Amino acid sequence: TYRYAFWILMAGLIFRAMPHMTLVSGYLQPFFAWNVWGILPTTIIVLVAINQPFTLWMLHSFFLNIPKDLDESAMCDGCNRFQAFRYVIIPIMWPGVITTGLFSFLLAYNDFTVTSMLLSDENETMIPAIASFLGTVQEEGKVMYAVAAVVSATAPLFFLVMFFQRQIVSGLTAGAVKG
């Protein structure tokens, strides 16, 4: 194990716990200066940067549960490090990777602050578009449109979770207990 791995993870989680408004406000001035505000790639980069500490923290707990003996025995059987990782470690890690990927996807999919601040109206994602159905103080909203949009936005997530249900359950239980 690395000497300062715990403190690096904690520093990353502290940044993850900060309000997104605080993190995104630092990006706005360079994005305007470089003329990359309002497009999807910059928003994707910011969402990856914000969700990366959570992803590393989850994967770290899964990696701690893999016995070191598996890696060593694969190398005794003639595998090099890459083959041992590919054929032994990845199949064991697959439920954890799927679970972490789905959690990260859900965090980015449901993000309102980052997408509403960094994207222009023509590149708007689903969550700010749904919020626009609710109206403002000056005009009445279309609440039934918002409800229909929420159901439409939730349906793909439901099917995605149902498709990966077995990996999610085994991934959640695998990273829960160290032993």
Model-derived features: where do they sit?
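A structural signal for multi-pass alpha-helical bundles of membrane permease subunits
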Residues: 1-179
